[in-house]
Amino acid sequence: MRVTSLDEICGTHQGDYKMTTKILSKHIGVIAVGSGLIGASVYLLMIYVTLAHIEAVSGHVPFDMRPFGYGPTEAATLLEALGVEGRAYYLSHQIALDTLYPAMLTLTLIATICWFGQRMPNRNLVRFGVAISIGIALFDYVENLGIAAMIWSWPEVSVPLVFATSTATILKSAFTTVAVLLTLLVGVSWTRLSEADVRP
């Protein structure tokens, strides 16, 4: 099985997949905008509907909205406060939506970074941004699995499971911050290079 490299993802590979990546490069802007709109819609739905409902029912901040993590006591407090219906809602509504969101966010960040990074002579920043963006989705899905496992195992609270899920939440938040900053940095570099091209 052939493993796709980061260069191929951004359409800069010069091997067998040159034609495919060239087509991808031409449409990368459309992909960035399209996935961005879907991702933003899902995000707003989570913030103003599912996560808001979870917080209203429990009186506590949901796991997803705790960038600095949580311990076993905090996890148990939230799970107990949710009640049977609240825990079921977390699984059927929030986790379901958060299955789509990480993929859309990661696709948006990768497409945007690759779009802006096409003019950059040094591809290292672009590669790093793509890798970090992929990390966001991985940790977000690990977080989702951990939250689901905590709900399924309630009223038992596994300390290792809580710490593993909390670590995934922290890393997801950190990677998201870094990826957004890198996207802005690549965008600024793209703007400067574009301005340099139009100067006489």
Listing of model-derived features with the role each one plays in the protein:
Residues 20-28, 86-93, 118-128, 157-168:
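Membrane-interfacial loop-to-transmembrane-helix junctions in polytopic alpha-helical membrane proteins
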Residues 188, 192-200:
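Short, charged juxtamembrane terminal tails flanking transmembrane helices
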Residues 21-93, 155:
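Interfacial loop at the N-terminal end of multi-pass membrane proteins
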